[in-house]
Amino acid sequence: MAMRPQDRYKSTTAGAVSANRNYKDTVFRMLFSDKKNLLSLYNAVNSRDYTNPDDLEIVTLENAIYMGMKNDLAFIIDTNLYLYEHQSTYNPNMPLRDLFYISSEYQKMLDQKSLYSSSLQKIPTPNFIEFYNGSDPVCDVFEHRLSSAFEHLSGEPKLELIVTVLNINEGHNALLMEHCKTLREYAQYVAKVRKYTADMSLNEAVECAVDECIKENILADFLRKNRAEVISMSIFEYDKEEEEKKLRKAEYEAGEKSGIQKAVLNTARHLLELNLLSLENISRATGLSIDELKKLQQ
């Protein structure tokens, strides 16, 4: 039997690769850990027409956990390695995370091969895709670049990693949704959960969304088979998304407050340097106390 291209990149560590189904699983990851669904998603993203799920090999690393985060799905097809990530919040740090993940993938693939030989060690071509369905408005397609994180970058970066982000909220990327029924129905399910959370508790909203989807034949077989697990994961995902929103809001407000305070201090210093107003008048204008103004004079 002829060797498939991806068979050349089998991990050298037994039991090191499989679909990620245990670490803080999500509905998206659970859906697309199924090779048939994953192949359909790959075909839609890449405008391909593969029909045999065995052409695709899932190689998600079970032990690739960094700072409490884990790669969602990794797979090889032909000589290409794809890292798929699902995000429900805006995250410009995905290129750095993917850099960690891809390094670990390559390390496993080449574990018993010499990197000191005179022969070039071939590796599958990496591709990085993020599927975003957060509530912050974003374009249908955009990119995150690792070089955006480099401080004092001069000229072209010597290292780059580009993550293509696809907005998979309902109403976005119509052509992609048209070619992947599972992705389209997943977007419909998420939209229903969000709609119902406006009027009822999260638990009730998720159960109502699941029931309605089954009734409308949206992911019906999947939801019937995995009802309890989907409800539990959806509640966890939504709670996590809301907590991350609160954290970002707090960080923004703290930064905004800090910026306002700096502006007040700069104004006070300028007025003191002009020496046109009394300390009392400057205090009234800036809201700073006399003692604070005296410290600025020192």
PLM regions and their residue ranges:
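Elongated, amphipathic alpha-helical interaction scaffolds
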Residues: 1-298
